[in-house]
UniProtKB/Swiss-Prot annotation:
Keywords: 4Fe-4S, Iron, Iron-sulfur, Metal-binding. [4Fe-4S] cluster binds at residues 151, 154. It comes from Vibrio vulnificus (strain YJ016). This is Fe/S biogenesis protein NfuA. Binds 1 [4Fe-4S] cluster per subunit. The cluster is presumably bound at the interface of two monomers. PANTHER family: FE_S BIOGENESIS PROTEIN NFUA, IRON-SULFUR CLUSTER SCAFFOLD PROTEIN NFU-RELATED. GO terms for biological process: iron-sulfur cluster assembly; protein maturation. Coiled coil: none annotated. The gene is nfuA. GO terms for molecular function: 4 iron, 4 sulfur cluster binding; iron ion binding. It comes from the Bacteria.
Amino acid sequence: MSNITITEAAQTHFANLLGQQPDGTNIRVFVVNPGTQNAECGVSYCPPEAVEATDTEIPYQSFSAYVDELSLPFLEDAEIDYVTDKMGSQLTLKAPNAKMRKVADDAPLLERVEYAIQTQVNPQLAGHGGHVKLMEITDAGVAIVAFGGGCNGCSMVDVTLKEGIEKELLQQFSGELTAVRDATEHDRGDHSYY
């Protein structure tokens, strides 16, 4: 069974929407381009004739959510919520594993660090149009990274590296990583955030 959470507020929202659809209509949760940097998650109506034998059904009180076989591992730990604030209401879908499959706790260090970068570090950098890529981990436990996008040439990259990325990764991989170093040849330009 997949670990997808649909909050009570989102369930109520879906139930209201589905009440206006033909009987037997449910929802489908999916990932387009799963496992890539271009991964995008979505929710759509799922009429009975669109259910495939390989789909996983996740039953809720007044509807079911169907997930296709390919999307399922990339929706691990996903959460769908319906948030209301003074600006209005909106459906939110958070899927930390959409761009990269969750790795096992006993996976090689390189895979675990890459996973942490893709799911924890890059979403924070994306707000500035930037990203970081793990190039290698040395025998001395130094993670070598390269910045791209808005981070390349940014005057704040040293602070981002030391106070953000390195601090987070050293805490998470205590005893395994000793440092994080930047291998980027920074080229300041219009693409740079600061």
